[in-house]
């Protein structure tokens, strides 16, 4: 409760940036280049819907994964055949089935022999397809051995996770069961990605204007203090920068190192209880961010309450407006945490996340382009390493595993913005890590602060073009995401070159790069030179520093 502390903002920045580099399309079975492709065993891995009917009445639907071998599975529901389902005897189908199949689909258990042998036995018995029940609750990719060069399997094979397979097997006790197998194609672009793009760009836009407005108010206050006399200006640094954190070169480098350690900790300790801990941390940050945003908005209409303070134990002086808003924020976060597995819980998560990002960008600042370049360049390498290169050591992408929450029963860690894919037959979410918004947002907020301080127009400044560059980079990220069959992409791989490159190129073209690089603020002629003890101080920046 109370004004957001710089220490908390810095800590939240670290937690959010640990998930800097992921934009993903949610749950999907991807192509696997490590699985061998040989003649007769070269299918792409696809998700398969298994629609069921019991006694000619439509029942549940299950989702499995198609095999590398066999014919491709029909993509159109209206073209898929509806056939009967039989439980294999023997149930593992490692020996030829004893019953007459006659075009039905065989349901078998995994184990005791190869997938290809089960499929061959089922085909020889006259089955039209085979559904294999896995012995664990996850999906598994059915592949072939490299020495199986004479495969000629002509029926599709689908693997179901253990729980889905057992439920399907129980349906057989209720009567005659028939199934329909098909694998609908995903849309090339889903509207969720468009809305996620708008959310990311809009968040940076709002945060940048708030940051620039706060900086301008600080300058106005600074000038008032200077007019009051030289003694007041001696306390300027403490008063003018209260509640703000300026990142320096050392912290920019250490930031990425510590974020890497934190990401490894998330990867190694990822479990149900650890996700619960992250939810608590996210709720604390979300309450702080939502409260800060609401107080800033409402203070214009409830100015007396915003300017009247009361001392609260452990929190110090707190405004009456903050006391009034805080319970609402706490209740909002608690309700989201309790019901976060509900269908529409993503709305609450996004509201808390956006408020948190906006607050951190308003508090944490990049002082100049040099620090911003180091921070974003390190984040760029961090992103690429943990999304792509980490596979060499961990045999999976650490960043994507953590972001999706693969080792838990959750839909992912809460430090993400997410929107459900509305027109995707497979459902799921489009997601983007907080760091993909926050880190470029720090640079873009710096651009707007500089533009306002230099009294630049929108077209002659840096903010507009940085925003365009960020939006373009994020758009390219989603193009790459779709071209790569939904594989999670390191968003900063595309965003950083666009955003930082545009900023540096414009600064160099306009001859302002040196000033942007070192000072981070324009030259300002000081109107209070008579108050300075030394004639060598020739501008207002010297006064404020």
Swiss-Prot record:
Residues 1-25 form the signal peptide. Glycans are attached at residues 81, 147. Its main location: membrane. The chain crosses the membrane at residues 194-214, 247-267, 277-297, 318-338, 344-364, 374-394, 428-448, 461-481, 486-506. It is a multi-pass membrane protein. GO terms for molecular function: aspartic endopeptidase activity, intramembrane cleaving. It is an enzyme of class 3 (hydrolase). The keyword Protease does not apply. One of its GO terms (biological process) is membrane protein proteolysis. SUPFAM superfamilies: PA domain. InterPro entries: PA_dom_sf, PA_domain, Peptidase_A22B_SPP, Preselin/SPP. Pfam families: PA, Peptidase_A22B. Residues 90-170 form the PA domain. It comes from the Eukaryota. One of its GO terms (cellular component) is endosome membrane. The active site is at residues 383, 436. Glycosylated. Residues 26-193, 268-276, 339-343, 395-427, 482-485 are lumenal. Belongs to the peptidase A22B family. PANTHER family: SIGNAL PEPTIDE PEPTIDASE (PTHR12174), SIGNAL PEPTIDE PEPTIDASE-LIKE 2 (PTHR12174:SF75). The PAL motif is required for normal active site conformation. This is Signal peptide peptidase-like 4.
